[in-house]
C-alpha cells in the first residue's frame, strides 16, 4: 500500500541543510527498505521531510513512524555532532496514495525546494489535510 508521509523537525528548526539532505534521505531510504517496505521518493526542505513509500503488508503505521523518527534522530545526532539537539516534532501526517497518483506525489516530493519558495509548510500541510478529508484543529498546527 502506498503512503505519503510528512514530518517536521522539532519546532520546525532548519536542521536539514542542503548538504545534509542527501545523506539523511539515503539513510531514511535504507531504513524503510530494510524494515518497512519500498521507498519510492524521499525529499523535503530544511525543516521537514516527505516520503512516498510502498509499505509492506502487516506493518503498523504508528510503530513504523516511531521507529523511523527515533532511529533517524539518533543517526543525525551521531553523524552530525553539531546537531546534538536535533529531534523530530511529535506527530506526523500519513496519507494513502492510489496507484494512479503515485507519479504525481513522487514529482511533488521532488519539487519541494521550489514549492517552498512560494508556499509555507503550514499552508502545505493544511492543504494535504483538506485534500485527504482529515479533520483538524488549526490551534494544533505549527
Segments (PLM) and residue ranges:
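Basic nucleic-acid-binding interfaces
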Residues: 1-142
Amino acid at each position: 500500500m502506498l503512503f505519503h508521509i510528512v514530518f517536521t523537525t522539532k519546532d520546525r528548526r532548519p536542521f536539514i541543510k542542503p548538504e545534509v539532505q542527501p545523506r539523511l534521505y539515503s539513510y531514511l531510504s535504507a531504513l524503510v527498505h530494510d524494515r518497512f517496505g519500498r521507498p519510492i521518493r524521499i525529499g523535503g526542505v530544511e525543516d521537514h521531510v516527505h516520503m512516498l513509500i510502498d509499505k509492506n503488508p502487516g506493518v503498523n503505521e504508528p510503530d513504523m513512524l516511531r521507529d523511523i523518527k527515533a532511529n533517524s534522530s539518533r543517526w543525525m545526532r551521531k553523524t552530525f555532532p553539531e546537531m546534538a539537539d536535533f529531534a523530530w516534532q511529535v506527530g506526523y501526517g500519513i496519507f494513502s496514495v492510489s496507484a494512479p497518483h503515485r507519479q504525481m506525489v513522487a514529482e511533488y516530493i521532488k519539487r519541494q525546494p521550489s514549492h517552498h519558495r512560494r508556499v509555507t509548510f503550514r499552508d502545505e500541510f493544511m492543504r494535504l489535510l483538506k485534500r485527504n478529508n482529515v479533520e483538524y484543529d488549526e490551534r494544533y498546527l505549527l
